[in-house]
Every structure is written in structure tokens, then in C-alpha cells.
Amino acid sequence: MDKQELTQLLQQVADGDVTPDDAALRLKMQPFQEIGAYAKVDFHRGIRQGVPEVIFGEGKAKEHILGIAREMLRSGQRTILITRLSAEAAAYLQTDLPLHYDSAARVGIIGELPAPGGKGRIVVATGGTSDIPVAEEAALTAEALGNAVTRLYDVGVSGLHRLLANLDTIMSARVIVAVAGMEGALPSVIGGLADCPVIAVPTSVGYGASLGGIAALLSMLNSCASGMSIVNIDNGFGAGYLASMINHLD
């Protein structure tokens, strides 16, 4: 149940279409559901935070992921997002559920994507093609949470004209997710051009001294561009989630 469904339920009670006892029963069943000894699915998260629970697939047995997803569907959740999902687990889920799987981003989505809402458009940009898997995790997360997303890939600082050729897209964005490895310069450049929040995502792409993304992370943390926030290395999900929150603010 999300905020809209809760409002509809309360309106039905006010209109006399649903009795208070029936409404109380529906709400009573909502907080969480314990599945065996391995999970407690949080059904109230959509009411508290505006977004239902997301499944982090890494480290979970494929049978456990299936059990959690089934319980979410049973509770009425229409779109289920699964991040860090292995190809093996995805194939297992697809034998039982309508799962769309992006193997590069390791993202699975069960059900239909919601119609885009929010105040505007989210732009997801990358420094290089190698950053696309992380960027796609951000883009697919944002789309699964009900946002219109524009992808702007391979526009890094080694060929700045590629970014400048897309200034209209940059300037019209509501939020920008800038994904880069190596020295992590792209978010600073975008932050100096855009009048909207920029979410920087360092990736682990790079040679030895990039230290698995630490160099890009430190570069972004020390940026002189204002209005920029930084998430963890390779955390496309965190960036897409935050971008969605910003895009849905009144």
C-alpha cells in the first residue's frame, strides 16, 4: 500500500463504501509479513517513505528472492525493483514471475513500469561507455519509481564538445545524475553548467591509481561546484532513488 492507496481507502470509509472495521483489517495486515526465518517484508514503507521496499539481490539465495517477491505481489505491489540481481537468479525468477532483466545493470523489474510523474525529467549522464552499467542501475531505478529519464552517455571531459552539444538537455533537467570513473571530473563540469541538483556517482572504472573508484570519490567530494551531492562508489541505485525523491518534491 502506498500513500495514494491509503488516501483512497480513507476516502472510501468517508463515503461509506468501506466500513471502518474492514479498513482497520486492511491496515492491520499491512505493517510487515514474516517469511519463514529469512525475511520480514515491510509493507508500510510505501506509506512512510513514498516508495515500496526494494529487494537487494546480492547475497540472497534465489529461492529467498522469489519468496520475497511473491509476498510483495500478494500484498498488491504492482512494480517490484530488484538490484544486484545475478543472471542465475534472474533466470530462476523468470520461470515463475514476469521479470524483465537488464544483465549489464544487474537490475530486475517485476510488473509494469509506472507512468512517469514528478515535476520534470531526470538526466543520467556518463563520462564513458564503461560507466553505463552503473548509470543504467540509476536510470532503471528512477524509471521504476515513476520518472521520465533521459540518458546522455559517453560525454566525458576527454571530449568536452560532446557534453556541450547537449546543453539544452542539461539545462532543462530537474535533476542530473552524473556517473564517472577515472578522475571523476564530469559531475563538477555539469555542476558548473546546470541550475538543478547534481548527484555524482563515482565508479570503479579506471587504472591502478584510481583505487577502485576512491580517486573519483575523493575528487567529487572536493568539487568546487555548488549544489552537488555524492553517493557511494558504483551506487547507481542510491543516485536514482535520490533523484526520484527530488523530482517528486512539491
What is each residue range found by the language model?
Residues E63-I65, D131-E136, L160-H161, A180-V189, ...:
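Short glycine/serine/threonine-rich phosphate/pyrophosphate-binding segments
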Residues T95-L97, L193-A194, C224-S226:
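Short, structured coil segments at secondary-structure junctions
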Residues T126, S130, D168-M171, V175, ...:
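C-terminal binding/interaction regions
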Residues A165-T203:
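Glycine-rich phosphate-binding loop
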